Amino acid sequence: TGETVTRAEAHSRGILHRTAHVWIIDGGNILLQKRSKTKDSYPGLLDISSAGHVDAGDDLIGSALRELKEELGISASSDELEFAGFRRAFYRGEFYGKPFLDNEIAAVYAYRKAVDIKKLVLQTSEVESVIWEDFYEVLSHVRSGDKRYCIYEDELLMIEKFVGGNCRG
């Protein structure tokens, strides 16, 4: 629409917006963040390594790099992110008694590096903790509807296809 709105307004009105998602991958494992219990959506659930809205005037890769730095303290460069593709999503739900309409186009990236989670600097307002999990175990949990995860199966399949055989650690 060309309209600049807040994150809250985008989700209350279902306005189409851009996001940047970064999956941190090390062999057959992916890094998941446990969202802060104070988040306005999906509180306390396991999620993508790093993700966020693209601010007005920002580009996709710059937003992905910003979110990595803000949420996890990772200073990456654009050549370290590998573009996996775009993912369109719409979710209609409710959190804290308020409608939540997530209407997004996500730019999905892979960051294939060994990350020492003990050295990460977590943005506690966003991220409670991080864990490494086996890619295929996460995929199995998501496919079975495990409510501990707020991850879309089709995005995991994008990442599986993108990294190919590198995910069987």
Which positions does each model-derived feature cover?
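Nudix hydrolase/Nudix homology domain
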Residues: 8, 44, 85-169
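Short, well-ordered strand-loop elements centered on a beta-strand within folded domains, enriched
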Residues: 1-4, 29-34, 118-122
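Short gly/pro-enriched beta-turn/loop segments at secondary-structure junctions
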Residues: 17, 78-79, 102-104
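Short, catalytically relevant binding-site loops at active-site mouths
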Residues: 37-39, 54-55, 89-91
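The catalytic Nudix box helix
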Residues: 32, 49-86
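Acidic, metal-coordinating catalytic segment for phosphate/diphosphate chemistry
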Residues: 1-21
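A glycine-rich, hydrophobic loop/mini-helix early in the fold
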Residues: 19-51
